[in-house]
Amino acid sequence: MFLCVIMKYNYAIKAEMETTMEIQMWKEILTPYDLAVEELQIKFNHIIKEYRQAGVYSPIEQVLGRVKSISSIIEKAQRRGIEIDKIQEKLFDIAGIRLICQFTEDIYTVVKLIKKRKDMTVISEKDYIKNIKESGYRSYHLIVHYEVETVKGTTIIPVEIQIRTLGMNFWAIIEHSLQYKYNGEIPAHVKERSSVRR
């Protein structure tokens, strides 16, 4: 009986240690992604500041950023059949920046602005404004390579930049919630009632 209790305790300790090690491993993996998001938020916010200091209209209204949670990364990898050791090679939206604009034409101004920059390289783009998704989702997506410096050296991080208007962002939030509510199959009558999608 006593031996059984000791064995269970040892298994619990081992499991806890393995979990702690996994969390530490993920923290190390995600550190450069955190850095990329922090730096890009500062840079895009500085663009807004420069426009406003010059007394001219800024095509960027708001800057948001995030790094996917560990659970979201694992869930997406499993959904796409990506092995854990291939996640960094095959998932390009671990780091994400969202640029909110007032008007649709501002989005294309921002895209041009990003393409001119020397500190990031556009590797792919998808225009969901001219090619609206069936769900009604609209946004302009860019994947850029962005270089960060850590204590371990230079690393190139893929970052997804989503550019959209306030209205598009509002619909995207609703659409995301509806996808979960209806398990990815939004009924036609719900789409029809959600006139904001256009």
Cite the ranges covered by each PLM segment.
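Charge-rich, low-complexity segments
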Residues: 2-92
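Short, structured coil/loop segments at alpha-helix boundaries
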Residues: 19-26, 30, 99, 184-189, ...
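Long beta-strand-rich cores associated with HINT superfamily self-processing modules
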Residues: 88, 101-198
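Terminal, regulation- and interaction-focused segments at domain boundaries
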Residues: 94-101
